[in-house]
A protein has these predicted regions:
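C-terminal engagement/docking regions of AAA+ P-loop ATPases
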Residues: 125, 129-174
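Residues immediately C-terminal
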Residues: 8-12, 59, 70, 133
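Hydrophobic positions in the central parallel beta-sheet of the AAA+
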Residues: 2-3, 52
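Conserved AAA+ ATPase core "coupling" helix
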Residues: 49, 60-98
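Alpha-helical scaffold elements adjacent to nucleotide-binding pockets in ATP/GTP-utilizing enzyme cores
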Residues: 17-25, 63-67, 80, 84-89, ...
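Short conserved motifs of the RecA-like P-loop NTPase core
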Residues: 4-5, 98-119
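AAA+/SF3 P-loop NTPase mechanochemical coupling elements
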Residues: 17, 34-54, 102-107, 152-155
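Conserved catalytic/switch belt of AAA+ P-loop NTPases
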Residues: 6-44, 66
């Protein structure tokens, strides 16, 4: 099994054309006798299962895309993102920033506000970055003596992340 992660970001430059090499690697007729030009040795790739990931298919050359079976995977729902944040991301970022459970609390409403008003993605990277930003600001409040314990809520989330970034389809803040 070989994972080709974010294949849509592969580019060509003066050093070579990666997509041409991938064409040879992914072609079932040619990959039995693939020649690795870097090491100068032949490699039999005929029994390898290739899995490629991409965020945007338009960045993949047509001939390369023709050698793949495209399986679209939908992003997380807002509810799934909430549970991922609650069960994993909050704890991870809290520990990363050296905060104890008693020093930092974030309620469900605040997490849901971050998801709906500060992120616009299928995954949770931006959600994690925003929770991390909240934690850093909590650290500053504690280190400056402004507060000993910080509870982040739906009502005060803008104090930590600023004005909402995203609106609903009607142009209204969600």
């Amino acid at each position: 099994l070989m994972l080709l992660d974010e294949i849509d970001k592969v580019s060509s430059d003066y050093k070579g054309d990666v997509s041409s090499a991938l064409l040879e690697v992914l072609d079932g007729e040619q990959n039995k006798e693939f020649n690795d030009h870097y090491f100068g040795v032949p490699v039999d790739l005929s029994n390898v299962l290739f899995i490629a990931t991409a965020n945007d298919l338009s960045g993949i050359p047509g001939p390369l895309l023709d050698r793949m079976e495209v399986i679209n995977i939908s992003g997380y729902t807002e509810n799934e993102k909430y549970h991922i944040a609650k069960l994993y991301l909050v704890e991870k970022t809290r520990e990363k920033n050296g905060l104890t459970k008693s020093q930092f609390k974030i309620d469900a409403g605040a997490i849901r506000e971050i998801i709906s008003h500060y992120t616009r993605e299928a995954g949770v990277r931006s959600l994690e970055r925003n929770i991390d930003k909240v934690c850093r600001k909590v650290c500053r409040k504690i280190l400056t003596g402004e507060m000993d314990v910080v509870k982040v809520t739906k009502k005060n989330i803008q104090d930590f992340l600023g004005p909402y970034k995203y609106k609903d389809e009607n142009g209204n803040l969600k």
